[in-house]
Swiss-Prot record:
Belongs to the UPF0179 family. PANTHER family: UPF0179 PROTEIN MJ1627. InterPro entries: UPF0179. It comes from the Archaea. This is UPF0179 protein UNCMA_27840. It holds the Pfam family UPF0179.
């Protein structure tokens, strides 16, 4: 599958390394008065991203990051999750709905992975053949890779 289009944003200089993955949590209070906030805050809150490139340019001062920020190219990361096996087909589009699960379940983190948003559309890029532990609700689960 082709690499998705990238977005240019600013990130703390210490974190500006290709391959670094992060979840954008939204603006800090200090960002409100910054003249660069439109570039920094152009990502979707609680979505997972990977840095795929660095832009040429200088470090810029930042009230949040002590060593300043750099311009980087980011793409939305694929998400590893589990879903009902009867719905897991390579290439299909789906709208993610978080299942109602017990937090003590062994699969809870895979059923509710970080960086995924309820109501967002994802494409199932791969259905893995490996076994997933038993579901407390009695569902048959498959591990999948989802892309926005």
């Amino acid at each position: 599958m082709a690499e998705p289009d990238f977005v240019i944003t600013l990130i703390g200089s210490k974190l500006a390394v290709p391959g670094t993955e992060f979840i954008y949590r939204g603006p800090a209070g200090e960002c409100e008065k910054c003249k660069l906030k439109n570039i920094c805050l152009n990502l979707d809150k609680n979505k997972k991203y990977r840095i795929v490139g660095l832009r040429n340019g200088m470090e810029l001062d930042c009230l949040v990051h002590d060593t300043g920020v750099k311009a980087v190219e980011v793409v939305a990361c694929p998400i590893i999750a589990v879903m009902e096996s009867r719905k897991a087909f390579n290439g299909s589009r789906m709208t993610y709905e978080a299942p109602e699960c017990d937090e003590s379940c062994l699969n809870f983190a895979l059923c509710h992975p970080e960086g995924i948003a309820t109501g967002e559309k994802y494409t199932i890029c791969e259905v893995f053949s490996e076994e997933v532990g038993p579901c407390k609700k009695g569902l048959t689960l498959k591990k999948v890779e989802l892309r926005p």
